[in-house]
């Protein structure tokens, strides 16, 4: 029955709903199942959300600091948590205002480890995000890679020192190669397809609350 309902919801919404949105719809219909089960069933059924392609926000400003090697090399799977993390920044625009989202995703299960929303793409957004992630780790870690693109934030010495102090190894995508960070790109695409493109937001505050509800759901 659950599989049938998933297929119905998926098709009724023109294949734009991912596992989070479908889980919410199931709950609205008094079908209690967690989002991890829905994601697993969608994978078994071969249901893939059709993401609308939009212009990608880029924080790349050239080589303003040290560029780390690509250690991840598109190996997006791991059988343990806190072994491979990915991060990136995306931009939303409502009227003439902008909002920036910076999350860290664990490749073990695709869950959001930590995130930060900011009206400006500044370095404090990145450090606040890291602080939230570090609180979920022991004082010192081993064998954890944090992968990003070559955005200016990730080239900063302060950022790199924060990772080193925690025992985290930095990895970066090759220049202008978004597929090297495909999991983060897909997360942004899914969020925008399920939430941002489907609803009309009158203000940045309204959008910010919706994103928090979406991620924390």
Predicted features by range, described:
Residues 51-57, 146-150, 166-183, 199-203:
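RNase H-like polynucleotidyl transferase catalytic core
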Residues 74, 78-113, 119-120:
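An active-site-proximal beta-strand-loop segment
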Residues 160-164, 177, 183-217:
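Charged alpha-helix within mobile-element recombinases
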């Amino acid at each position: 029955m659950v599989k049938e309902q998933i297929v119905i919801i998926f098709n009724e919404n023109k294949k734009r709903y991912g596992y989070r949105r479908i889980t919410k719809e199931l709950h609205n219909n008094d079908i209690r199942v967690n989002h991890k089960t829905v994601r697993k069933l969608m994978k078994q059924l071969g249901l893939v959300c059709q993401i609308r392609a939009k212009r990608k926000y880029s924080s790349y400003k050239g080589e303003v600091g040290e560029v780390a090697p690509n250690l991840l090399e598109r190996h997006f799977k791991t059988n343990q948590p806190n072994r491979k993390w990915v991060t990136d920044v995306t931009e939303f625009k409502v009227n003439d205002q902008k909002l920036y989202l910076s999350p860290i995703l664990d490749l073990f299960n695709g869950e959001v480890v930590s995130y930060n929303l900011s009206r400006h793409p500044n370095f404090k957004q990145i450090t606040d995000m890291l602080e939230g992630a570090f609180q979920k780790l022991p004082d010192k870690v081993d064998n954890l890679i944090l992968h990003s693109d070559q955005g200016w934030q990730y080239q900063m010495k302060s950022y790199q020192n924060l990772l080193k102090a925690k025992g985290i190894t930095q990895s970066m995508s090759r220049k202008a190669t978004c597929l090297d960070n495909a999991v983060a790109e897909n997360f942004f695409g899914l969020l925008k397809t399920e939430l941002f493109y489907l609803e009309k937001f009158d203000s940045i505050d309204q959008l910010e609350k919706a994103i928090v509800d979406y991620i924390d759901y």
